[in-house]
UniProtKB/Swiss-Prot annotation:
Subunit field text: F-type ATPases have 2 components, F(1) - the catalytic core - and F(0) - the membrane proton channel. F(1) has five subunits: alpha(3), beta(3), gamma(1), delta(1), epsilon(1). F(0) has three main subunits: a(1), b(2) and c(10-14). The alpha and beta chains form an alternating ring which encloses part of the gamma chain. F(1) is attached to F(0) by a central stalk formed by the gamma and epsilon chains, while a peripheral stalk is formed by the delta and b chains.
NCBIfam families named in the record: ATP_synt_b, PRK13453.1
Keywords, in A-Z order: ATP synthesis, Cell membrane, CF(0), Hydrogen ion transport, Ion transport, Membrane, Transmembrane, Transmembrane helix, Transport
Organism (species): Staphylococcus epidermidis (strain ATCC 35984 / DSM 28319 / BCRC 17069 / CCUG 31568 / BM 3577 / RP62A)
Gene Ontology MF term list: proton-transporting ATP synthase activity, rotational mechanism; proton-transporting ATPase activity, rotational mechanism
Cellular compartments annotated: Cell membrane
Family according to the record: Belongs to the ATPase B chain family.
SUPFAM superfamilies with a match to the protein in the record: F1F0 ATP synthase subunit B, membrane domain
Gene (name only): atpF
CDD domains assigned to the protein according to its UniProt record, in alphabetical order: ATP-synt_Fo_b (cd06503)
Any one of the GO CC terms: plasma membrane
Protein name as annotated: ATP synthase subunit b
Length: 171
């Protein structure tokens, strides 16, 4: 049975020596692969995994930083918009004040011009009345002198005119 046990169905026998050498060679090959190929390969794979994890962590940190930056930008934009609105409101208030001041100054200037014009009118009126009084007195003297056929002095004439003007003014 030993002779039959060493033969397989196809009639080939097992050679234990060759099998042992093949097995030892295979084990040596596995050890060499583990030492020279698997170790460096595993090291490369571990480094790659660390790099990927680091890249993921960096990406997450960058995302967090981007969110913070976006929030800061929104806050800055809001502050800027508020500041612009305040500047616009202040400008409107200042414009209203200037408008009121300009109107006030224009009214004061117009009132001053009106007062000046009224003073000028009153002054001219007084001059005109004085001129008319002088002319009336001259005419009165002329008429009176023709009527009386005599000349009266200038002082008497003025007193007479003033007397008649006062009497005319009282009526």
């Amino acid at each position: 049975m030993t002779a039959t046990a060493n033969t397989f169905i196809l009639g080939a026998g097992v050679e234990w020596g060759t099998t042992f050498v093949t097995l030892v060679t295979f084990v040596i090959l596995i050890i060499l692969l583990k030492k020279f190929a698997w170790g460096p390969l595993k090291e490369v794979m571990d480094k790659r995994e660390r790099d990927i994890n680091k890249d993921i962590d960096d990406a997450e940190q960058a995302k967090i930083n981007a969110q913070k930056l976006e929030e800061e930008n929104r806050k800055t934009l809001k502050e800027t918009q508020d500041e612009v609105q305040k500047i616009l409101d202040d400008a409107k208030i200042q414009a209203r004040k200037q408008h009121e001041e300009i109107i006030h100054e224009a009214n004061e200037k117009a009132n001053g011009m009106i007062e000046t014009a009224q003073s000028e009118i009153n002054s001219q009126k007084e001059r005109a009345i004085s001129d008319i009084n002088n002319q009336v007195s001259e005419l009165s003297v002329l008429i009176a002198s023709k009527v009386l056929r005599k000349e009266i002095s200038e002082q008497d004439q003025k007193e007479l005119v003033e007397k008649y003007l006062k009497e005319a003014g009282d009526k």
